[in-house]
Structure formats: structure tokens, C-alpha cells
From Swiss-Prot:
One of its GO terms (cellular component) is extracellular space. This is Beta-defensin 2. The keyword Metal-binding does not apply. It is found in: Secreted. It holds the Pfam family Defensin_beta. Has bactericidal activity. Active against E.coli ML35 and S.aureus 502A. SMART domains: DEFSN. InterPro entries: Beta/alpha-defensin_C (IPR006080), Defensin_beta-like (IPR001855). Neutrophilic granules. SUPFAM superfamilies: Defensin-like. The gene is DEFB2.
């Protein structure tokens, strides 16, 4: 996952920090600083 569109398609969301709680990073959104997270 390398942008916010594919992040959304994969049921993820973008955060500028570490992925919260039980979510896991599945890629990035707008560069390496913004992470795409998804709950499992």
C-alpha cells in the first residue's frame, strides 16, 4: 500500500503517528511518515 486510495480500498486508514491499539501498519499514505493502518 503506497497511497491513501489503496489504503482505503484495503479498509485501512491514514495516521501521522504509530498505528493505535490493535491496528497494524499495512503500508503508507502520503510518504513514509504517514502510515496506513488497519484493524485485525
Amino acid at each position: 500500500v503506497r497511497n491513501h486510495v489503496t489504503c482505503r480500498i484495503n479498509r485501512g486508514f491514514c495516521v501521522p503517528i504509530r498505528c493505535p491499539g490493535r491496528t497494524r501498519q499495512i503500508g503508507t499514505c502520503f510518504g513514509p511518515r504517514i502510515k496506513c493502518c488497519r484493524s485485525w
